[in-house]
Design a protein with these regions (language model features):
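Generic hydrophobic/packing signal
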Residues: 62, 69-71, 86, 90
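Glycine-rich "substrate-gating" loop/helix at the edge of Rossmann-like oxidoreductase active sites
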Residues: 44-46, 72-77
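Glycine-rich anion/phosphate-binding loops
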Residues: 16-20, 75-88
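N-terminal beta1-alpha1-beta2 module of alpha/beta enzyme domains
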Residues: 1-62, 66-67
Length: 90
């Protein structure tokens, strides 16, 4: 039987600092989750306007967990720059 892969998004939005999100990612990696996801959101108190920058911070403190965005608004970006940014993060 195939393995079930389980991912999670942040649950504590009291601080959207890179450190807080990285701490959450390390915690779920230690619990055995497979992936950690951030949304792109430009409005409200929980706005994350640049998830790739925060995921870069998360990648510096994790080693096994996969990282991704639940949404990434390509229509707001130059397609070449967006592709390069994602490639650098990979």
């Amino acid at each position: 039987m195939d393995k079930l892969h389980v991912g999670i998004t942040p649950w504590d939005f009291s601080s959207l600092s890179a450190k807080n999100l990285a701490d959450q990612a390390v915690f779920v990696e230690d619990l055995g989750y497979d992936s950690f996801w951030l949304p792109e959101n430009h409005f409200g108190e929980n706005a994350i306007p640049d998830p790739l920058t925060l995921l870069a911070a998360v990648s510096g403190v994790t080693s096994k967990i996969k990282l991704g965005t639940t949404s990434y608004l390509l229509t707001l970006r130059n397609p070449i720059q967006a592709a390069e940014q994602v490639a650098v993060l990979d």
